[in-house]
Amino acid sequence: MGVGFGYTEYTDTFNRKYVNNVINFKKTQIKDSVKTKLSDIISKGYSYNKYIKICKYSVEALEIVKKCLFCKNFLCKIKVFKRIKKHIHVKFFHNDYVDKIKEKFNKLVNKSLKKQINHVCLNSEISLKKKLKVLCLTHNYNIIFEDYGYNFKCKVYGWHVYKKRLDFGNEENVKNGKYCIFTMLEY
């Protein structure tokens, strides 16, 4: 009885160590491949307003892509496309994008000042499923307007719960809300 217990305990620790080593090895492989792909794209010059395929989708790969692009202050949009398999794509924006955003922001600021509202909402009605889009847009707005002292944030609003019918008369409660990207104005 004592021998069997010690043996399984030893094999369990051995298996855990082996699995952890394999997972760490795969993570470093993903990290290296994603970083080399991004550095190649950036060094060779990238085309604007076109999606460029980076790698197959995994949570680790997505986090690495976000870290690499967000720390270098690129105006970009990260998107996961699913055709046959999921892949991560990146779209870099041209300076025309900056001009359009500034023009839209100036119109919204003028409206807010006339109505004496202390915030400006650049994007609203973004579905909760599109959290990656919200993070990219918030990051882009913060880069564009960092010289002007504006800090953009995102929040969830408009929560409502409804019942969704499933098979055989079962129901499920579904929470639904929207994202809003906004900044506060100081008078």
Swiss-Prot record:
The protein's UniProt keywords, in alphabetical order, are:
Lipoprotein, Myristate
Tell me which domain of life the UniProt entry assigns to the organism this sequence originates from: Viruses
Kindly list the residues that the UniProt entry marks as N-myristoyl glycine lipid attachment points.
G2
One Pfam entry for this protein is DUF5864
Q: Which family is it part of?
A: Belongs to the mimivirus L332/L333/L334 family.
This chain belongs to the protein called Uncharacterized protein L334
Q: Which organism is it from?
A: Acanthamoeba polyphaga mimivirus (APMV)
